[in-house]
């Protein structure tokens, strides 16, 4: 399966990249077929984190003078939006560091556990097409963070691109990759959970012991799923808030470039700047929708009930066990643990609510920005 091979290559490349960038102290061991802890990687990891947090002050000083005076009609308002964006990046960096310190080992252990269930218990041969396409889409969005062409050409025609511009953009790219690396790990765990639940539901069982084994495995997977949601809950919440704000600022920036087409900002490369702004906006919206689709797929697999084996359907003990499993599933489905921060009992309306929120705030911020001072 060509898409499956491409998915495996993307996974290996992503795992290698996060090691180079210092986002993980675990590496994949092909011999043991699991993630393995390394003290050397942990030292390298924490060194880069300290440097990253220490460099924030220089980035903040640069960001305060990023937009030149007279570049926008409402320069003061633009500077306020820019300042909020910078401090939200700091919040994301601190949250990511905190979660990295608390949960990295648990996340890697969970990944190893799911991989073991898929390979040994469920005899996985090839991932489903949905798994491959969803993961490739997420990895594409992750690599899109390398693109800082818009900020690089923002001053085109006003001043030359210098070393500080390059360093500041690399810092922004690094923090964007750090944020999305954790989100990719979250999506990867959700996809593995969905695959495990799907394959477990397809297992054939002709005896009572087979049914019991299937039900116990299912309950184990559901417990893993609740644990994953709890570990990533705050990061996902903060990341979604940041992305809505960033898209709002992107709308404002695009509108400004459009409305000031005869001003200094529009003298050079206006069409290219507008195109890059639209691409940035759409990629973020697609990333949010992708998360919703994956969560919806996982919930669909969780809500399926294992079939009772036909040849022992008359067995009172077997039928009662199946009935109790269905009852436990109904209780768990409405449990607060499945509703962490209100984000994990999702349907597609939630995705479009986020999109609508981003567009609405974009319109409001444009109106505020152009109120005569």
Curated annotation (Swiss-Prot):
Residues 30-82, 154-170, 252-273, 372-373 are extracellular. It holds the Pfam family 7tm_7. It is a multi-pass membrane protein. GO terms for cellular component: axon; dendrite; neuronal cell body; plasma membrane. Its main location: membrane. Keywords: Cell membrane, Membrane, Receptor, Transducer, Transmembrane, Transmembrane helix. InterPro entries: 7TM_chemorcpt. It is found in: Cell membrane. GO terms for biological process: chemosensory behavior; male courtship behavior; monoatomic ion transmembrane transport; sensory perception of taste; signal transduction. Belongs to the insect chemoreceptor superfamily. Gustatory receptor (GR) family. Gr10a subfamily. Probable gustatory receptor which mediates acceptance or avoidance behavior, depending on its substrates. This is Putative gustatory receptor 10b. The gene is Gr10b.
């Amino acid at each position: 399966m060509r898409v499956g091979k491409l998915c495996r290559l993307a996974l290996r490349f992503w795992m290698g990249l996060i090691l180079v960038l210092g986002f993980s102290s675990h590496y994949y061991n092909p011999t043991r077929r699991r993630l393995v802890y390394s003290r050397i990687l942990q030292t390298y990891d924490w060194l880069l984190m300290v440097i990253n947090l220490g460099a924030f002050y220089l980035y903040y000083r640069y960001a305060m003078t990023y937009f030149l005076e007279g570049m926008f009609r409402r320069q003061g308002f633009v500077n306020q939006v820019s300042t909020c964006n910078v401090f939200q990046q700091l919040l994301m960096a601190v949250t990511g560091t905190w979660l990295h310190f608390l949960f990295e080992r648990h996340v890697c252990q969970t990944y190893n556990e799911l991989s073991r269930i898929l390979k040994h218990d469920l005899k996985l041969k090839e991932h489903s097409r949905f798994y491959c396409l969803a993961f490739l889409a997420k990895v594409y969005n992750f690599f899109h963070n390398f693109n800082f062409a818009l900020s690089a050409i923002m001053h085109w025609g006003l001043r030359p691109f210098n070393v500080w511009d390059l360093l500041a953009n690399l810092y922004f790219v690094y923090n964007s990759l750090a944020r999305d690396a954790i989100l990719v790990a979250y999506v990867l765990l959700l996809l593995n959970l969905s695959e495990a639940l799907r394959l477990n539901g397809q297992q054939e069982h002709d005896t009572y012991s087979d049914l019991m084994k299937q039900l116990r495995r299912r309950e184990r997977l559901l417990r893993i799923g609740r644990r994953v949601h709890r570990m990533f809950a705050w990061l996902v919440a903060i990341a979604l808030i940041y992305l809505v704000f960033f898209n709002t600022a992107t709308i404002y920036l695009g509108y400004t470039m459009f409305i000031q087409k005869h001003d200094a900002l529009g003298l050079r490369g206006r069409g290219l700047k507008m195109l890059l702004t639209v691409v940035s906006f759409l990629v973020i919206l697609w990333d949010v929708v992708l998360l919703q689709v994956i969560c919806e797929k996982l919930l669909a697999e969780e809500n399926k009930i294992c079939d009772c084996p036909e040849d022992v359907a008359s067995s009172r003990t077997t039928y009662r066990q199946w009935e109790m499993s269905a009852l436990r599933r109904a209780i768990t489905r409405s449990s607060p643990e499945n509703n962490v921060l209100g984000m994990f009992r999702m349907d597609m309306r939630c995705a479009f609510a986020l999109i609508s929120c981003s567009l609405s705030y974009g319109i409001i911020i444009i109106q505020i920005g152009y109120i005569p001072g």
